[in-house]
Regions:
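Alpha/beta-hydrolase
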Residues: 63, 98-100, 189, 260
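Short substrate-entry loop that stabilizes the transition state in hydrolases
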Residues: 55-57, 65-107, 237
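C-terminal catalytic histidine-bearing segment of alpha/beta-hydrolase fold enzymes
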Residues: 242, 251-292
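N-terminal cap/lid segment of alpha/beta-hydrolase-fold proteins
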Residues: 26-55
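The conserved beta1-alpha1 loop
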Residues: 63-65, 229
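Alpha/beta-hydrolase active-site loop
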Residues: 113-153
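The feature captures the conserved acid-bearing segment of alpha/beta-hydrolase catalytic domains
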Residues: 185, 191-251, 256
Length: 292
């Protein structure tokens, strides 16, 4: 018995050493941060971070959320999800975090002067929202980014992960319905559309229609997905996100669902905090390892 106990602790200690060595190796990877202008049909800036070296590397695309007001979009940061993106880069990925069309300098909507920026992911009025096309619009941008980065010989064309938050997560779910061959897996944080109508917590735009649209995407989606939501998300609360997941799975989609404990004052922006990385990274690591 004494020998068995010693063997158990020796094995456990060895496993801990392996994980510690892996963590140190990942943290010591040198990375390089850049700002790119992507010459797509609708040109856009992107934050890019990658390991130092020529590559090619597996690709991660990170889709941000939506701001409906032009003023808010005009102040949108050029670098979004920096800490999360660097986490992926230290694990060998080239990460592209595009700033959507209609954000930053392109947020020029002045209706009284008949000036409108190229913001194309509105869902319309809550009486008849079009969640479906709003998601697919951003999904098409992801496909163009994959094509462009592959043509530049910077990435491994058949090794792409797509990550999205909020409306960007919704676009990632939409992308999964297209089953693009290069995309191996998709990770959605706090995904959805139509949250906090009029700025009111847990006040959603046509939630039944959102669930229906989720099921519609699930009918054709076969890409492995990881969905992460947070208990104190006032945009897409647990009851709604669980309904969405159930509808998606019942329709045929493949998605692993996790509801995380409350985080800060508002869980919706979980992925944007460096303090959240130790909480979500084990789930993401396990999920991505399972796709290899």
């Amino acid at each position: 018995m004494h020998r068995l106990i010693l063997r158990f602790f020796a094995t456990a200690f060895l496993v801990l050493l392996i994980f510690a060595a892996r963590a140190r190796a990942e943290d010591e990877v040198r990375i390089q941060e850049e700002i790119w202008a992507l010459p797509l049909a609708l040109p856009m800036f992107a934050y890019l971070v990658r390991p130092v070296g020529d590559g090619p590397f597996p690709l991660v695309i990170m889709n941000h959320g939506v701001s409906l007001k032009p003023t808010d979009r005009s102040f949108f940061p050029l670098v979004e999800f920096r800490d999360a993106a660097k986490w992926f880069a230290r694990r060998g990925y080239l990460v592209v975090a595009p700033v959507g069309s209609g954000y930053g300098a392109q947020a020029i909507d002045i209706p009284e002067r008949a000036l409108y920026g190229p913001f194309f992911s509105k869902v319309g009025k809550c009486t008849n929202p079009n969640f479906h096309d709003a998601g697919l619009a951003v999904a098409q941008v992801d496909l163009r980014i994959i094509d462009y980065m592959a043509a530049e010989k910077r990435i491994i064309p058949d090794d792409v992960i797509v990550v999205g938050q909020s409306a960007g997560g919704w676009a990632s779910i939409a992308l999964s319905s297209l089953n693009p061959p290069p995309v191996k897996a998709i990770i959605a944080f706090a995904a959805g559309r139509g949250g906090r109508v009029d700025g009111k917590p847990n006040n959603n735009c046509a939630p039944d229609r959102l669930v229906e649209a989720t099921a519609d995407f699930g009918r054709t989606s076969r890409v492995p997905m990881l969905w992460i939501y947070i208990e104190n998300d006032t945009f897409f609360g647990p009851a709604l996100s669980q309904r969405m997941h159930a509808a998606f799975i019942s329709a045929g989609g493949r998605a692993e669902y996790h509801l995380m404990p409350p985080f800060g004052n508002e869980g919706h922006f979980f992925i944007g905090s460096p303090d959240a990385i130790p909480l979500w990274s084990p789930l993401v690591t396990k999920f991505l390892d399972a796709q290899k």
